């Protein structure tokens, strides 16, 4: 019988790599707390209609990339979430969250699912962190989430990033721009690839998302959305840029940036990394005031958010050597059992140490002392506590500092005190 393997486009994450994930997640949570964002968690699957209405029927995500299923032949279609914003908005509307507070600031670290061709930093099951700020219509909200995102990157030590930003205007602005794009691309209709021909009819803005090298020169000559913006939209965008200038956040205005989701309006942005090659996007976001109405609300709801791909983020960090100094802490103390028959007593000692809050490891396999010491060194234990027959009878145990080789014999209460003092001294180091 053939050995089962992980599903294509998924991957297992083992303890040595988990330490990196915990570190990055810890930084995200710390920065989120600084900015007053609280964590939200939503279901892994939603009704398919949520994403069709929320993301947009003409997007690649809805058209090609969703994992959709129908558990009940007579029931509604369900989809594994391909992104988080639509689900977060659905949850907030369902709970009527903004009736409790006029502003809602939420963040998430969540697994998502898309039918993509697996490659480095792009899996069919992947993780994003992101934030959504609901209830604030002025440009300060865009600056708030952008600053939050960029502070996460700087706190992680990441460099070589490029922030591109554009204004997509409001519905009227985009309607004018779609007609301008249709007029521009129509004479080139025979030169377009099949996906772009379809987009020309349904939503010509999506042509600007094409990665087809043969179309890039044509796309570069397309009209700029900025020329279709009304004065109010221009003023809104310029205020966002002034906030970024005030915070000394470098950016490039890219008038061809439209992002891949239909719900964006006004400011939209994307961050790329020089470490990621052709697929260089590490995250992005923007305003999406009309999403609430698309999901059944009676009015638009001011909203802005971003999402960052964790796998891509960590690839960029790895290439910049930002994990090199990350040293996952092993156990503080390793309980070494000198005779197999003393294992029960050693487990009681380990229980006391753990109950007092000390990170403790113990051999349960009855291996030799040499093997146990080798294991303690491999794990990076700071101390070894030896349990033999005489130690058990006297209640005094040998405690060895594995860095200095200094060894002393103490009762268990004194050992616990010594170890807590060692933890305190380590925590006090700069």
Swiss-Prot record:
What EC identifiers does the entry list?
6.1.1.21
Q: Which domain of life is it from?
A: Bacteria
Q: List the disulfide bonds.
A: none
- PROSITE patterns membership: AA_TRNA_LIGASE_II
Task: Give one Pfam hit by family name.
Answer: HGTP_anticodon
Its Gene Ontology cellular component terms are:
cytoplasm
Keyword Iron-sulfur annotated: no
Task: Give UniProt keywords alphabetically.
Answer: Aminoacyl-tRNA synthetase, ATP-binding, Cytoplasm, Ligase, Nucleotide-binding, Protein biosynthesis
**Broad class of where this protein is predominantly found:** cytoplasm
SUPFAM superfamilies documented for this protein? Class II aaRS ABD-related, Class II aaRS and biotin synthetases
Q: Does the keyword Ligase apply?
A: yes
Q: Where in the cell is it found?
A: Cytoplasm
Q: Name any one GO molecular function.
A: ATP binding
* Catalyzed chemical reaction(s): tRNA(His) + L-histidine + ATP = L-histidyl-tRNA(His) + AMP + diphosphate + H(+)
Gene Ontology BP, a term = histidyl-tRNA aminoacylation
| Record note on quaternary structure | Homodimer.
Which NCBIfam families does the entry mention?
hisS
What family is this? Belongs to the class-II aminoacyl-tRNA synthetase family.
Q: What is this protein called?
A: Histidine--tRNA ligase
> What organism, scientifically named, is this protein from?
Chlorobaculum parvum (strain DSM 263 / NCIMB 8327) (Chlorobium vibrioforme subsp. thiosulfatophilum)
């Amino acid at each position: 019988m053939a050995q089962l393997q992980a599903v294509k486009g998924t991957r297992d994450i083992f303890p040595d790599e988990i330490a990196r994930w915990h570190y990055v997640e810890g930084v995200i949570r710390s920065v989120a707390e600084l900015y007053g964002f609280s964590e939200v968690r939503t279901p892994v699957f939603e009704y398919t209609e949520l994403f069709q209405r929320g993301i947009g029927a003409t997007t690649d995500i809805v058209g090609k990339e969703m994992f959709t299923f129908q558990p009940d032949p007579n029931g509604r279609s369900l989809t594994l979430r391909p992104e988080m914003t639509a689900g977060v908005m659905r949850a907030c509307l369902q709970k009527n969250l903004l009736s409790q507070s006029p502003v809602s600031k939420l963040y998430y670290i969540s697994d998502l699912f898309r039918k993509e061709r697996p490659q480095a930093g792009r899996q069919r099951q992947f993780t994003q962190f992101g934030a959504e700020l609901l209830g604030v219509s002025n440009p300060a909200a865009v600056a708030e989430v952008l600053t939050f995102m960029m502070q996460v990157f700087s706190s992680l030590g990441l460099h070589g990033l490029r922030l591109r930003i554009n204004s997509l205007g409001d519905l009227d602005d985009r309607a004018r721009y779609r007609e301008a794009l249709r007029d521009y691309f129509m004479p080139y209709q025979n030169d377009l690839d099949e996906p772009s021909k379809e987009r020309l009819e349904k939503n010509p803005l999506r042509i600007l998302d094409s990665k087809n090298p043969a179309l890039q020169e044509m796309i570069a000559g397309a009209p700029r959305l900025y020329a279709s913006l009304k004065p109010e939209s221009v003023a809104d965008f310029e205020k966002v840029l002034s906030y970024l200038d005030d915070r000394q956040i470098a950016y490039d205005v890219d008038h061809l940036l439209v992002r891949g989701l239909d719900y964006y309006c006004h400011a939209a942005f994307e961050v790329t990394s020089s470490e990621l090659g052709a697929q260089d996007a590490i995250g992005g976001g923007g305003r999406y005031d009309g999403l609430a109405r698309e999901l059944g609300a009676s009015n638009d709801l001011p909203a802005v958010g971003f999402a960052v791909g964790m796998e891509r983020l960590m690839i960029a960090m790895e290439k910049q050597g930002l994990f090199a100094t990350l040293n996952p802490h092993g156990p503080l103390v390793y309980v070494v059992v000198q005779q197999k028959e003393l294992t029960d007593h050693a487990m009681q000692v380990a229980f006391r140490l753990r109950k007092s809050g000390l990170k403790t490891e113990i051999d349960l396999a009855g291996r030799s002392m040499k093997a146990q010491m080798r294991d303690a060194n491999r794990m990076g234990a700071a101390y070894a506590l030896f349990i033999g027959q005489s130690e058990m009878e006297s209640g005094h145990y040998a405690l060895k500092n594995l860095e200095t080789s200094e060894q002393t014999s103490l009762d268990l209460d004194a050992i616990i005190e010594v170890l807590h003092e060692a933890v305190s001294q380590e925590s006090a180091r700069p």
